[in-house]
């Protein structure tokens, strides 16, 4: 079996283990409602979560809306309205979908209930902006390109929205909101996942303004005024349950690698750094442990960031892999792969990237300089050229990313 075959097996097994179906059904064992049940599902895993809820509750759900990324829905679900919208930058389709959700949850009684299914990507997909959409798109693009992490990004986005930062739960009053959350943020902070539409907000106006200063963001007077308006700090009508996170993804990958004969070392399930730094670190680990007496697998779960310096095509997981290529060159056998559990990496159709000990030479033979490619943020065409892209298609889940270093036993 090649290292690429091994990587593909681990990826498939990991993704199977973190599908939201069973987790949603377990969480719904705590759910009860005497009146109408309105289901609202947002995020990249919205369709799969809503489908699991429909399988569990069926006709108890009276109406609802499912809002997911383009290409991530899989057909009708009972009486639910299905919407697809833009991600990572919000668009008009997302605004129309959010308005439908607001309409469905307006005028509910105390005995009714909103079943709110939340997954990563919800920040862009579920939006009712307090500034013009064009300005929100510009601010989102600035945040995505400046190197801000997801907590900093969401601290800003909450205050520019009528549904984020706990404001959706306020809108639903007096009806209770029962949230089932698939976490894509390290530490599972409820107020940051999808920008916390049904969670009390722990961030402050001062923190939002500090992000503006740190990255030199260009904001209008209207947007700055929004950043100085505080968000709800208590929501007595809201209850949340986290059902999945990156730790489950790491557990599944570890088990899959062990089944294939590898001894696993989990470096972290809180990875948070520049993508290329993560790749270079994994390559350094490979050189330190080259030619081991037993197969070794080093894994790290979390979410890296990319500071855009070019206008190429790629994503953070592709940059993790590409940045490792030079450090693996010359080793007997070694591979690094990194992928997003949602099946997409940046604005591409790939989930991530794979490199091994021969990838650097293959890139140079093709006339490609990995350092220059990283400067231009153009990992996708380079990895495509050497067969290093990972394709899974939309997975129906979203619990961060996983990077892994494989070192077979010395022969």
Question: Which residues does each PLM region occupy?
Answer:
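Internal gly/pro-rich beta-alpha loop/helix module
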Residues: 132-218, 227-230
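Internal helix-turn-beta structural module
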Residues: 322-411
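Active-site segments that bind and position negatively charged phosphate/pyrophosphate groups
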Residues: 261-338, 346-347
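N-terminal glycine-/serine-/threonine-rich phosphate-binding loop
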Residues: 1-38, 47-57, 88-110, 243-248, ...
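Accessory alpha-helical/coil subdomains and C-terminal extensions
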Residues: 157, 175-178, 200-281, 285
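Short beta-strand segments
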Residues: 40-41, 65-68, 115-120, 179-185, ...
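Glycine-rich oxoanion-binding loops at beta->alpha junctions
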Residues: 67-111, 152, 156-157
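A glycine- and small-aliphatic-rich helix-loop capping segment at beta-alpha/alpha-beta transitions
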Residues: 52-61, 79-82, 102, 106, ...
